[in-house]
Structure formats: structure tokens, C-alpha cells
Amino acid sequence: MPYRMSRQAYAETYGPTVGDRIRLADTELFIQVEQDFTTYGDEVKFGGGKVIRDGMGQSPIANADGAVDLVITNALILDWWGIVKADIGIKDGKIFKIGKAGNPYIQDHVDIIIGPGTEALAGEGMILTAGGIDTHIHFICPQQIEVAIASGITTMIGGGTGPATGTNATTCTPGPWNMYRMLQAADAFPMNLGFLGKGNASQPQGLTEQIFAGAIGLKLHEDWGTTPATIDTCLSVADEYDVQVAIHTDTLNEAGFVEDTIAAFKNRAIHTYHTEGAGGGHAPDIIKVCGQANVLPSSTNPTRPYTVNTLDEHLDMLMVCHHLDPAIAEDVAFAESRIRRETIAAEDILHDLGAFSMIASDSQAMGRVGEVIIRTWQTSHKMKVQRGSLAGDGKADNLRAKRYVAKYTINPAITHGISQYVGSVEAGKLADLCLWRPGFFGVKPEIVIKGGMIAWSQMGDANASIPTPQPVHMRPMFGSFAGARNATSLTFVSQAALERDIPQQLGLRKSAVAVSGTRQLTKQEMKLNDALPHIEVDPETYEVRADGELLTCEPATVLPMAQRYFLF
């Protein structure tokens, strides 16, 4: 006889199912379940008197014969490709299957086998996303990594050597010796890491040696001199060795204007950092490049979203980050030229249109490493409130949610040639995953999984009789320590470095894998963020138009995902 449950009772027991809507934190964003891979009446759930017991939902099948190492039950997956309810099987540190878990001897349609060697993680009522990818890291201090993983970031790409003056301003790990030391340091962290070399050179040999040393890309930064000659040389070397180039262009227009920089690209793929320009770049019109097919544009989070406080905080940040002197008029003028309310407002809308493809932090160098995910969803919320639902979205905001989650997951992975390993919740990829309570979505993850093992988690008093007594906060778990962190995280290097056995020569303990497929990319590969509007910027008023339409919006006076969740 069938048993009927109300939707509320079902959701409280097994999590939401097809047609149910879920609010994301305290935003005005709602997502709706599109598909449910589980079977009504045959769901698996762990606990006393529940299903995952021997002879019931747990089979006698050994892991060697197909049972998974970890099953996440009844989770709601939010990814660029869909919003679905499913069980997730993890085996050998990778996502094995998204589907229906259980005991194939007594249950139908089981494609994730639970056995005596299977750990269980309750995903009922939880949202599951891929671990975030931050591709604009100034490696100024190692404590950034703790803050990042606690926020849901599992991959960090950028450059630096610590709190050196160059690193404070530019995301470069310059030269082989510095690159080797940073690769060795990477072994200490439960984080996938990749380092960019310095790309500013008008001759190739100094760039080539950095790629041979392990750089996964090169960074062109105006503080080192981003001229048309250095752009051309850097991209030519990148083309030869299949690594990405990231660029911070010439704010002062000393060596040319934005048109000269675009010409120097010669239609070659390039990742433009802080494409709006407050973080640096041709003033006032670097934002034009987001309409170029070969440009993969990102934002950094201090301008995300546009608020009443955005302009005021930027000037002081900029003076510190770029080693400027407030007593020198030219330095102040340089700083002020980068901060424009009109282009920052337009940036909000260009994200909502899918014309800006990625969001990153610019950590400790005008950006906040722990706020990439928060700022992304705050931008999405602001655009929902100010612009209404996207075409195709109705009572739920599925398209908008998928567009925005792609900005810090799959699109940065594609851009930097690592999407075969990370960036989405898909079978075969490293099991870098975040579980969120819906009320805390995007703000504070409940559990961060690295390579199939819990690395960080909300955890209460370790002396308590149960895990939940206060104070509860994010803490490192066993996946963050000793050999476990090396077995569950990756170090990204160039193919040229692998061919030269650099990881072995340095004694690296993490698996080192090569980036690939970076040089033939176009914006068309940016998932749900591939719009190519024609951008015009008025040089006097800084007004921005896309395909002739003025892009403007009001600054937010209040935001969700803010004081409600934090004491400080």
C-alpha cells in the first residue's frame, strides 16, 4: 500500500524534492528543485532505526567490489548544470556518481553501492556545491588559506612570496627560486594551489624559465610595466607552453590606451583581472574589454556589489596596496582615477547579463579572501531586487543562481586549465565539495570536503559530550593534517615542469598535475556567462553603455548575508 506524506513532512525528513523552493540565506533569491534522482519510498538515510543498516540499505559488498568510500545522502546540488536532489557517491577521493544510493540486492535502480566500508554523511535539507576557486590571490600570508577554506574555497591561484612589497601589490611569484619555495610550501595546506610567474618582460627567456619551474601561468601587472611589448611577449610564451595569462593593465595609459592593449592581445586568450578598473587598468574604459571574444573577464570582490560604502573605502586601500604616498599629488591623482561610481554600477549589471564571467578576491591587496562567495551572492541578490527576475526565471531564480555559482566554480577552472580536476559537481572530478544549511548558504559552510575527506567543519566545544555545544565555529578537521592533506589536495604546475620532473626534484608530497587547454579558449566557453555586448564609456562622464543601453543602478544601502551572521 502506498504511504502519503505532505510536502512539508517529506522535506523535513528527506530534504526538498521536485517543485520545492528553497530560500538562499536571507536574500531574495529562491531556487527550485528541477530533478530528484532518489526513489520515493526507497530513500536511504543514516541513523538509529533508519535505512542504512546491514541487510537493508547497506549491502555486504566490499569497497574492492564496488562500494563507495563515502555517501552523501539526499543533498540538493546547486551547480551550473542544474539544481537536483541526489545521493552522491565518493570513491578514491573523487566523485564517483550522482544518483541513487543503497543496496542493489534489495533496492531497484541503485548506482551508488553502500557497503560495510562506506561512511555516511547526511545531506538531507542541505545544499551541496562545488568548492570555490579563487583565481586572484596575493600570497601575502599563509593565514589567508585558513580563512579561504573556512568560507568554502578549495582552490587558490595567484602569486607571491609572502609580505614582500612586490607581492603586496602584484600577484606574481617571480623567478625559479621563489617558485620552488612556494611549491614546497604548498604541501603544508589542505588547499589546491597554483602559482603565477611574473609576465612582464620584452624578451622570452625570463618567462620561459618560470614556466619550466612550475608556473601555471604568467601575470602581467602595471606596477612591473604592462606595455604592448610585454603583453605580446608574454602571450607568445604562454601560447608555446599552454599556460594562461592574467593581466592588470596600464591605469595611467602611459604606454598606450585600452585599444592598444586589445591590439597587443592579437585575439589570444587572456584573463583580465578586476575588469571594471577600480582594482587597476586603463582609466576610465578598461571595462570595454568584456566585449572581446578572446577576453575572459573577472571582478575582484571589493567592488561587489556597488554600495554606499564602496567608493569611500577604496582610496585608502589603493594607497596602501600600490605603495603610494598621500603626500604626493601625482600618487593621489593616480588613485582617484581608478575609483568611478559609474563603472562600478555598470559592473553589477554586466555580471547579471553574464558579460563578466568570474569573481575572485584580490586577497589583502584590495580584496577580502573570505568573502568571494558572500560578495557573489550579494551581487545576485542586489540585481534581483533592482532588476527583477531574469528572462526564463519565474517563481524561482534558477538561471540566476546557476549563472552566479559558475562565476566562482567552473569558469575559473576552465580559464586556468584545471576543469578536468575541479570546478563542478560531476563524476570523475576531485571531491572538493561544500555542504551548506540553506539559512547560512554562501555565508558559512557547514562542512568543507577536500578530495573526499572532511577538511574543515563547523564544530562545537571539543570537551562537550556531543559535537554541537557552543562555541561552534569553523575548525580544521582530520583531512587538514599530515599525510591526509597531501592525499586529498593537488598542486597545479605546468606540463613543462612535469616533463622536467620538478615535483620529484623538490620532494613535493602532494600530487602535482598539469594545467592544459588554456590557449584556445574564448568567452563562449564561459558557462552561462558568455555575453559579448559592445561596450562604450563616455570619457567625460564615465557613463557605460552596452549595445547602446545605459548601464546604471543605485548603490545598495543594506545587504543580506551581512551583520545578521557576524558579530564583528
UniProtKB/Swiss-Prot annotation:
Active site: 322
Database matches in CDD domains: Urease_alpha
Molecular function as annotated in GO: nickel cation binding; urease activity
Catalytic activity: urea + 2 H2O + H(+) = hydrogencarbonate + 2 NH4(+)
SUPFAM superfamilies: Composite domain of metallo-dependent hydrolases (SSF51338), Metallo-dependent hydrolases (SSF51556)
Modified-residue entries (N6-carboxylysine), positions: 219
Domain Urease: 131-568
A single BP term in Gene Ontology: urea catabolic process
Pathway info: Nitrogen metabolism; urea degradation; CO(2) and NH(3) from urea (urease route): step 1/1
Localization terms from the record: Cytoplasm
Cofactor: Ni cation
UniProt remark on cofactor binding: Binds 2 nickel ions per subunit.
Keyword Signal: no
InterPro entries named in the record: Amidohydro-rel, Metal-dep_hydrolase_composite, Metal_Hydrolase, Urease_alpha_N_dom, Urease_alpha_subunit, Urease_AS, Urease_asu, Urease_asu_c
A Pfam family reported for this protein in Swiss-Prot or TrEMBL: Amidohydro_1
Designated name of the protein: Urease subunit alpha
Organism, scientific name: Trichormus variabilis (strain ATCC 29413 / PCC 7937) (Anabaena variabilis)
